[in-house]
Amino acid sequence: APICQLYWDAVNFRPTANSPYAYQTAKHPFNVGYDLNHSTTQTQYYTKRTLKYLLEEYNIDGFRFDLSKGITQNDYGTDVTAWGRYDAWRINRLDDYHKHIQSISPGAFTILEHFADVDEEKELGNRGMMMWGNAVYQATEAAMGFVNTSDFGWGVDYIKRGMPGNSVIAYASSHDEERMGYKCKMFGNAF
């Protein structure tokens, strides 16, 4: 990424230790590419300026932050359980970005692919952000004709999840999940 190459360790092929934009190594599991350091004012400025540009130049109606749980300064290493626990710093950083978005385009959506503890997701929902709700399993079961295992409650029903209203965006297909069409063809009882 060009922003990482501004402070680049060519020998180790990673950002330098003094980079104000990126960590040398990711602070969490499931990282893809380089991990931006959202605790620095430089990265916060860069992120907010990018959000502003996209809102004003392209008149988009909001953002979906992929792997939003990765916006953290805590070093979780490979501990997925610890990474998913309540993180007040992460909540406040995401809230700051959300407020920035709202200051430019009131009503714009902030959708988070978050998958953290329910308490953290509830707090983010109470602050006006929406959580990506995984309903892939249920949708695939329904598409395959297995009605008894296709309860959409958790992925779709914000009340069942204990979330504030309008804070869950369910999805039935994703680049991170098994292909629904393949499973329907190979295992479905509807064909």
Regions found by a protein language model. Give the residues of each.
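Generic secondary-structure boundary/loop-capping signal
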Residues: 18, 33-35, 121, 129, ...
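Solvent-exposed, flexible loop/coil residues
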Residues: 11-12, 40, 136, 148-150, ...
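Loop/helix patches that line or flank the sugar-binding groove of alpha-linked glycan CAZymes
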Residues: 162-191
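Active-site-proximal helices and loops of the catalytic beta/alpha 8
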Residues: 67-172
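Short conserved micro-motifs at the rims of enzyme active sites and ligand-binding pockets
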Residues: 51, 122-123, 181-185
